[in-house]
Amino acid sequence: MKETRVAYRYAKSLIDLAAENGVLDRVNADMAGIESVFKQNHQLVAVMKNPIVQGDKKHAILEALFGGKVDNFTMSLLSLLTKKHREAVVFEISSEFQRQYREKMGIKIVEVTTTQPITEDQRANFKAIMASKASKVELIEKIDEKILGGFVLKMDDQQIDESVIAKLNKIKNKFTEQVINY
């Protein structure tokens, strides 16, 4: 809970500062990149959370990974976090920043699940389907062979399930219902 509160405050401050200085989109791209690096490298997360590793070593690691590749505001945040011994929450801050950025910009996350990677045309069609529910959408693509075919779209608490497995389950339920009623 404490990490969530800390992440919220740092992310909010960074969003406000970046927006005030006209670099919000650049900092958003940086935070998405940082989030991706931390998601892909569990050893990096472990090092950042390890209290035995010195703060200057953690700063050197972050500098080597992101120095010269991210905006000055982003690098300043990373430096501040190591000085304040908050480097353990870098991943949480980047995730929270992404959430707050999407909220500020009116972007909704739409999760699309298919059995194989989707094409650009399909991506455009999915965005068009969801355009009536949100003006800006960000597609998160997932592969799940258990749905057998078709797709499942999820946004907030809404779901459009056009998968083969869902249709088979509907047929099975109707058949079972008819057998019971017979």
UniProtKB/Swiss-Prot annotation:
Keywords: ATP synthesis, Cell inner membrane, Cell membrane, CF(1), Hydrogen ion transport, Ion transport, Membrane, Transport. Gene3D superfamilies: N-terminal domain of the delta subunit of the F1F0-ATP synthase. The keyword Ion transport applies. Transmembrane segments: none annotated. It is found in: Cell inner membrane. GO terms for molecular function: proton-transporting ATP synthase activity, rotational mechanism. Signal peptide: none annotated. GO terms for cellular component: plasma membrane; proton-transporting ATP synthase complex. It is a peripheral membrane protein. F-type ATPases have 2 components, F(1) - the catalytic core - and F(0) - the membrane proton channel. F(1) has five subunits: alpha(3), beta(3), gamma(1), delta(1), epsilon(1). F(0) has three main subunits: a(1), b(2) and c(10-14). The alpha and beta chains form an alternating ring which encloses part of the gamma chain. F(1) is attached to F(0) by a central stalk formed by the gamma and epsilon chains, while a peripheral stalk is formed by the delta and b chains. F(1)F(0) ATP synthase produces ATP from ADP in the presence of a proton or sodium gradient. F-type ATPases consist of two structural domains, F(1) containing the extramembraneous catalytic core and F(0) containing the membrane proton channel, linked together by a central stalk and a peripheral stalk. During catalysis, ATP synthesis in the catalytic domain of F(1) is coupled via a rotary mechanism of the central stalk subunits to proton translocation. This protein is part of the stalk that links CF(0) to CF(1). It either transmits conformational changes from CF(0) to CF(1) or is implicated in proton conduction. Belongs to the ATPase delta chain family. This is ATP synthase subunit delta. It comes from Cytophaga hutchinsonii (strain ATCC 33406 / DSM 1761 / CIP 103989 / NBRC 15051 / NCIMB 9469 / D465). The lineage of its organism: Bacteria, Pseudomonadati, Bacteroidota, Cytophagia, Cytophagales.
